[in-house]
């Protein structure tokens, strides 16, 4: 089942409300068990087609129910105003493809997630709150934020899945960002890109391969994949759920 409520992120949007979601295993009310938690971005796209931005969700609740996976998933919808999703889901300032400058507010978002949202989840649900049992995942800009979270908030997250991460936002600073980050030796990271996402100029593939190499050099336990016929879409990311769940040892 998926519970929904409203939250505020004062540092980003003041008292404006946005939806938060928590997937709970079907046996949650039947046991006293405590569960690992997977935090995710773009919560509105995860569970219900009717709420998904483009009419297709990840179908995540259906997958978890069908496979009886003992896991809590906690997520918040993005900011839908203008380019605010890009802003909140980027750790760095960048210029969008239309030439518009975007101010990176990703650190503020992660400070709220780790300082307010995670404590709320741990206090109100039967979680295993330690780092070993806490993971994070997302796609596109959420994939970029997953990489940022695992790199800069490693004391909270021992594992992450970055699907089709928007590495272009870092520009030429991508390698420097990875090299200056501190990863615990037990950090597990899944990262992929769809073969149909690569541009003709090869920039996306270069960024992906560069990030892969830098992460391996840092000693991260990395599983890196190019998904055959993969696209930048919820339908494509849904098909990767069994794979990254296995890599993150959440299944």
List each language-model region with its residue ranges:
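Non-catalytic cap/lid and distal C-terminal segments of serine-dependent acyl enzymes
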Residues: 1-251
């Amino acid at each position: 089942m998926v519970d929904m409520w409203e939250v505020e992120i004062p540092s980003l949007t003041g008292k404006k409300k946005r939806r938060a979601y928590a997937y709970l295993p079907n046996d949650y009310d039947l046991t006293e068990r405590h569960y690992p938690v997977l935090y995710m971005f773009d919560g509105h796209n995860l569970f219900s087609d009717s709420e998904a931005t483009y009419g297709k969700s990840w179908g995540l609740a259906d997958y978890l129910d069908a496979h009886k996976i003992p896991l809590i998933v906690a997520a918040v919808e993005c900011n839908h105003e203008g380019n605010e999703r890009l802003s909140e889901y980027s750790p760095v300032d960048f210029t969008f493809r239309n030439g518009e400058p975007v101010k990176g507010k990703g650190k503020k978002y992660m400070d709220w997630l780790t300082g307010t949202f995670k404590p709320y989840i741990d206090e109100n649900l039967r979680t295993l709150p330690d780092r070993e049992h806490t993971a994070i995942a997302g796609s596109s800009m959420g994939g970029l934020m997953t990489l940022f979270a695992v790199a800069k908030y490693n004391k909270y997250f021992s594992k992450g899945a970055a699907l089709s991460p928007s590495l272009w936002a870092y520009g030429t600073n991508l390698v420097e960002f990875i090299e200056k980050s501190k990863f615990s030796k037990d950090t597990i990271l899944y990262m992929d890109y769809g073969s149909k996402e690569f541009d003709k100029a090869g920039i996306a593939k270069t960024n992906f391969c560069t990030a892969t190499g830098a992460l391996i050099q840092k000693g991260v336990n990395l599983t890196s994949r190019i998904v055959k016929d993969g696209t930048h879409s919820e339908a494509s990311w849904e098909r990767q759920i069994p794979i990254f769940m296995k890599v993150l040892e959440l299944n």
